[in-house]
Amino acid sequence: MNMLIVGRVVASVGGSGLQTLCFVIGCTMVGERSRPLVISILSCAFAVAAIVGPIIGGAFTTHVTWRWCFYINLPIGGLAIIMFLLTYKAENKGILQQIKDAIGTISSFTFSKFRHQVNFKRLMNGIIFKFDFFGFALCSAGLVLFLLGLTFGGNKYSWNSGQVIAYLVLGVLLFIFSLVYDFFLFDKFNPEPDNISYRPLLLRRLVAKPAIIIINMVTFLLCTGYNGQMIYSVQFFQLIFASSAWKAGLHLIPIVITNVIAAIASGVITKKLGLVKPLLIFGGVLGVIGAGLMTLMTNTSTKSTQIGVLLLPGFSLGFALQASLMSAQLQITKDRPEAAMDFIEVTAFNTFMKSLGTTLGGVLSTTVFSASFHNKVSRAHLEPYEGKTVDDMILYRLQNYDGSHSTIGNILSDSIKNVFWMDLGFYALGFLFCSFSSNKKLIIPKKDETPEDNLEDK
């Protein structure tokens, strides 16, 4: 188990960095007007991967072994590396020239040169200030402790236990201190204020900008609700109908289809008409309606209902997420010397909020489900389930399946419905923030004008 945890941590670090860099590289390769299409294409890739991954993983788990869920990453990751090296030319150099330069650098390296040429004080300053080591450590530790508190609360420990309270309080305090450090202390300790590469993890000039805060809150809230829906849509079919992991994952196909359609449509509309906020609001409205419809999904729902209610969440995220990233990038002042760095920072912050919402959505959904399920089982006085943890109850249910309309089937259905109600709340808040987002849009040049990247306030 320890090896599994360490492996997942390493994979998560790489995966989160890949997503951010894909958007940064993709968006910088084209002009601003073509950027919506690039964002749409990348979003489609991530949306398909996010759904196809669980389906393939479920098939491996059901028919082979769960270890293949990890083995399959080796050829896929290797192919991705080869494609990247052969196609991306950061310095307009071919892959062979880059390899020759790297070999030349390594062959000419000696420890004596390193010892005399490298100033270790400057090296430490680079680690601390270029990578914002302290801000990153405080932020990461705070978020991890807070999420652990939500995970353990009501499951391994009671909510009023010292362990859970300590996790939650320390997590919040560390996260707040990371903001204080980045916003107010970083510049005071910075030994090279004029060095543009010495920047905090969260730059106050950008992060504290109301338009950027609002649009990233949209991303955070919608991703929180969406991931809760995705996780417990699969759990709905596994726990209530005893579907295998593979068959339960197949029910997510409607979301893939609608998400891809909406993402492509969003990119085309933004490129042709320059619209951003209308797409945000449209996506927010679809999200609220879709989340409301998902609360109608119970153990007595028909097959058509189970498929139909999963369509709108895909449409919602397809329209809203692309527009939110585009809106965040439009807030950059392009005539500043740091505009290129600001662009990377804003894109990375938007991706961070997306990842944070996805993570928190999974944890909060599990917390709501576990608390609801445990309380309902306790009130029902079901003898086989008394005195068991939620995980043990679920295991017993799967080993002693008694149908979807049994007492425990009804309890599971009601508990999952509570998760969907929570998701509806996040979508409603997301729609509220959509309404207050920036009105900036892309300017579409007239036919007799030279296309230029520009902004316009409406």
UniProtKB/Swiss-Prot annotation:
Cellular localisation: Vacuole membrane
Keyword annotations: Amino-acid transport, Glycoprotein, Membrane, Transmembrane, Transmembrane helix, Transport, Vacuole
Ranges in the topological domain labelled Cytoplasmic: 1-9, 58-67, 154-163, 227-248, 299-306, 437-458
Superkingdom to which the source organism belongs: Eukaryota
Vacuolar topology ranges: 31-36, 89-132, 185-205, 270-277, 328-415
Alphabetized Gene3D superfamilies for the sequence: MFS general substrate transporter like domains
Sample GO molecular function, one term: transmembrane transporter activity
GO biological process: basic amino acid transport; transmembrane transport
Membrane topology, from the record: Multi-pass membrane protein
PANTHER family assigned to the protein according to its UniProt record, in alphabetical order: AZOLE RESISTANCE PROTEIN 1-RELATED, MAJOR FACILITATOR SUPERFAMILY
Name under which the protein is recorded: Vacuolar basic amino acid transporter 3
Organism: Saccharomyces cerevisiae (strain ATCC 204508 / S288c)
